[in-house]
Amino acid sequence: MNEPVTKELVIHKIKHNLRRLRTAIKWIIFSILSGLLIGMVGIAFYFGMTWVTDTRTAYPWLIFFLPLGGIMIILLYHLLHDEKDTGTNLVLSAIHSGDEIPLRMAPLIFISTLITHLFGGSAGREGAALQLGGSIGNSLGRLFRFDEKDKHIMIMCGMSAAFSALFGTPMAAAIFPLEVVSVGIMHYSALVPCVISALVAHGLALHFQIAPPSFAILDIPEFGISSAVTVTILAVLCALVSILFCISLHYNEAIYRKFIKNPYLRAAAGGCIIILLTLLVGNQDYNGTGVNIISKCFDGTVAPEAFLLKIIFTALTLGAGFKGGEIVPTFFIGASFGCLFGTLTGFSPTLCAAIGMAAIFCGVTNSPITSLLISFEMFGFAAMPFLLLAIAFSYMLSGYYGLYRSQKIMYSKFKTSYINKQTH
């Protein structure tokens, strides 16, 4: 039976809808503000990264100062009383458990990532962007006296804005913070704020002529049973590579800490190891982000050992205490491994490079929807069936490993059961 319409009911519904409207207006305003402010910081970080990368490329001897750069980073964190920095893990933890993110994280990760890349450490930039955005977003939430739950949304807004400004993929940037924190549960309450923040930051980046990444897949075969089987095999292998990368990152850090207790000596030793490896390899292809090597993979040319060397260089760099992200190295590993698989099997090396990037990104972040969206933004829609299949298998078979130890897997990857466990 329908509820009788009374004056009190009408007033209640009007008040309820006005509250919704007020909430919507609030988040439109604050997400635009977040997109503008954090987008500008992300753009400054992009140009800083471009400058240090160009400088290191022009003066390759700068790598010999990498141990000194590591000592500078440790000293910087010590001076600002952040010796126990946990990076992106702290940002994720702040969203699902309410941990506080200090504003000093933003300048610390900004400067220390530039130092790492200037002197040739192997790291990315998007992980740093997540810390930048999360730190500033949290501080904006405090400034405007938001309650704990609204502050969590501001953190996610900041992550979206920084990721979008720096990487140029607003769809993936909007969804990633919603998906990565608690795998199996999407924080849809932050959807509109994150979308607006990502689009505003992306618009700013385009205004400053920051081109989004785009890779052309030269040969896309017809999708059928044979090609589906080949892609499934590649996806299974990518899941294994993603596990290897996560284990390498976590265990390298543990080994450094076990054998070298002093953080200054640890950073200096790590820098010396990277210098030695660079000299042994004979080039600097595995230092920095390696974006140029990713582009080569889409020309169908890559050294067979490239993905393994990038895993080693990145794990040794970040484990020693240098700063940066893990996402661009993940793309490097995925593109080079996929290209190698395609070359060995004769199955479109450029398509396999794209599949490798998407599948390994999914395996290490446990974020299949973001992986699919970022694939569409980087490669277009033509390879959709291949990417969709590979991402699905990589998500399932990568198990409960992940880049971020504070990430929680809320629901099993194999059954419809609630497990609430942290990645390892």
List the model feature ranges, each with a label.
Residues 1-424:
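Alpha-helical transmembrane segments and immediately membrane-proximal extracytoplasmic
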